[in-house]
């Protein structure tokens, strides 16, 4: 019986103080030049720029965007 009361108190306390939602990390604003060079990721085809992380395949600059030069030309074959 005591366990039931304790569980009820804990549940009500959790409901009274809801958990904070995790906010995604802030990214720097992208410049127009970077946005104009935005190209699709070769793995998942989702368009992304140098400032962001691909949501689909989780790749970053070293695995995906390193293939694009500063003019936005595909360097890998």
Swiss-Prot record:
Which controlled-vocabulary keywords does the entry list?
Disulfide bond, Secreted, Signal, Toxin
* Tissue expression as described in the entry: Expressed by the venom duct.
| Positions of the propeptide removed during maturation | 17-32
- Cite any additional comment in the entry: The gene superfamily associated with this precursor was described as 'B superfamily' in PubMed:23152539, but this name was already assigned to the conantokin precursors, therefore the superfamily was renamed 'B2 superfamily'.
- Similarity comment: Belongs to the conotoxin B2 family.
Q: What is known of its domains?
A: The cysteine framework is VIII (C-C-C-C-C-C-C-C-C-C).
Q: Write one Gene Ontology MF term.
A: toxin activity
Source organism per UniProt: Conus marmoreus
- Which first-to-last residue range defines the signal peptide? 1-16
List the taxonomic lineage. Eukaryota, Metazoa, Spiralia, Lophotrochozoa, Mollusca
Q: Which domain of life is it from?
A: Eukaryota
Task: Give any Gene Ontology cellular component.
Answer: extracellular region
In its record, the post-translational modification comment is: Contains 5 disulfide bonds.
Q: Which named protein is this?
A: Conotoxin Mr8.2
Q: Where is the protein situated, by its record's location annotation?
A: Secreted
């Amino acid at each position: 019986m005591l366990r039931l009361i304790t569980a009820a108190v804990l549940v009500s306390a959790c409901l009274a103080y809801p958990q904070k939602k995790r906010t995604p990390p802030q990214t720097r604003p992208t410049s127009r030049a970077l946005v104009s060079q935005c190209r699709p990721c070769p793995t998942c085809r989702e368009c992304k720029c140098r400032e962001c992380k691909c949501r689909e395949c989780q790749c970053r600059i070293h695995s995906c965007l390193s293939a694009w030069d500063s003019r936005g030309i595909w360097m890998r074959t």
